Amino acid sequence: MNIVEVRHPLVQHKIGLLRDASLSTKGFRELVTELGTLLAYEATANLETESHTQPGWAGPVNVQRIAGAKITLVPILRAGLGMLPGVLALIPTARVSVVGLQRDEETLQPVPYFERLTGRLEERDALILDPMLATGGTLIATIDMLKRAGARRIKGIFLVAAPEGLKALEAVHPDVEVYTAAIDDHLNDKGYILPGLGDAGDRIFGTRVE
């Protein structure tokens, strides 16, 4: 499985700022947006292009354009929505597919409660957006959903990832590429990433308990 930990100095600087527990909701949200743009830039570096001839100021000119159907972004509710503006700033023509999952309290497995996917997934690159890759359960369920709908080229973009989640993903979907700003140490007994970011959804939307 292709796992890319983006070591660009700007990415590392910004993920360090995100780890500050005293950071305001506004500051956290802005950094998530910025990191979404930077990580999406890395994740789209190997998109296929095709030649196209268009009018230029001095006559016809041959240029490169992204081949195939437009990319679809797949934010996982709710925290994934925080990354969406930054990625759309880079890829404004992208389609957006939205997925929501919640944990079944008896089986502890993720269960979809919302699914709105764009069409022609078999022709598109799908970029899953989620700040945290922890156990991998939600991500794996999302990939299962996308593949059932026809998606064949899937990448995941995360701010931080846990080794346990990466291992779980590789066991069932080794074809999926992962891009992250940081691979953290481990999960604690409650499934939180350490050192992590805390609850990214609460910090993005300002719903954490003060």
Swiss-Prot record:
Pfam families in the record: UPRTase
Keyword line: Allosteric enzyme, Glycosyltransferase, GTP-binding, Magnesium, Nucleotide-binding, Transferase
Activity regulation remarks: Allosterically activated by GTP.
Binding residue positions for 5-phospho-alpha-D-ribose 1-diphosphate: 78, 103, 130-138, 199
Necessary cofactors: Mg(2+)
Domain of life the protein comes from: Bacteria
Keyword Ribonucleoprotein carried by entry: no
InterPro entries: PRibTrfase_dom, PRTase-like, Upp_B, UPRTase/APRTase, Ura_phspho_trans
Gene3D superfamilies, per database record: 3.40.50.2020
UniProt pathway annotation: Pyrimidine metabolism; UMP biosynthesis via salvage pathway; UMP from uracil: step 1/1
Record-level GO BP terms: UMP salvage; uracil salvage
GO terms, molecular function: GTP binding; magnesium ion binding; uracil phosphoribosyltransferase activity
Top EC class for this record: transferase
E.C. number: 2.4.2.9
Reactions catalysed: UMP + diphosphate = 5-phospho-alpha-D-ribose 1-diphosphate + uracil
Cofactor note: Binds 1 Mg(2+) ion per subunit. The magnesium is bound as Mg-PRPP.
Residues annotated as binding uracil: 193, 198-200
Functional description taken from the UniProt entry: Catalyzes the conversion of uracil and 5-phospho-alpha-D-ribose 1-diphosphate (PRPP) to UMP and diphosphate.
UniProt similarity note: Belongs to the UPRTase family.
Protein name as catalogued: Uracil phosphoribosyltransferase
Originating species: Xanthomonas oryzae pv. oryzae (strain MAFF 311018)
The organism's taxonomic lineage, starting at the top: Bacteria, Pseudomonadati, Pseudomonadota, Gammaproteobacteria, Lysobacterales
